[in-house]
């Protein structure tokens, strides 16, 4: 029960980071591109390292114990790429012109303008928030299940997800703010889109928990690894490189991997 509460709280923490992104947009004067590039790289480094070095092999151990070496290994690989296909399919719901993974600068919230009152623009902003919510749902399941099995890994994933949710929160707020001129409304929809992560945890509790044996755990964990790697390669690293200064994104990746490696060694 204690692990379940911790798993839910960490998932909630990761989801609420989208709202934090909106608050940063309201309060910050300029975007610190060096820090942003480093932080996104750090998040990618943590996700890639923990997925490929720890989560994948824990999934393999669970599945080979249940199915035998050959079938277990095959299913681990299939589930890993299945996780990539799942999150890639979800990303297909996000059109290029409303992609919430495109990093916006906080300066965009400061430019004075008259609200456009364009229903199509407002619809675009709402769809952006909805698309991000759909994208966050499997991340919530991933964070919850990971924490349930190993709180140290769950904590690392929650922090990495939270870091990458902050600029996404800004990305949701900007189009809604330009459509309405209302910062409160922009914050509200950004905040609500992040609640899809704890909703994913609730679904995991209600639907997955009764069936969470070694087979189910191994499949989910392998899919989690695939999802985390896809997010890192498709979202975090391109965004980090876009705002890179003096190789800060690469320093972030290396720092994230080193941080995760030391954490796993200390907790071994």
UniProtKB/Swiss-Prot annotation:
Keywords: Cell membrane, Ion transport, Iron, Membrane, Metal-binding, Transmembrane, Transmembrane helix, Transport, Zinc, Zinc transport. The keyword Zinc applies. The keyword Cell inner membrane does not apply. It holds the Pfam family Zip. Its main location: membrane. GO terms for cellular component: plasma membrane. It comes from Oceanobacillus iheyensis (strain DSM 14371 / CIP 107618 / JCM 11309 / KCTC 3954 / HTE831). It is a multi-pass membrane protein. Zn(2+) binds at residues 139, 164, 168. GO terms for molecular function: metal ion binding; zinc ion transmembrane transporter activity. The gene is zupT. This is Zinc transporter ZupT. It comes from the Bacteria. Fe(2+) binds at residues 136, 139, 165, 168, 197.
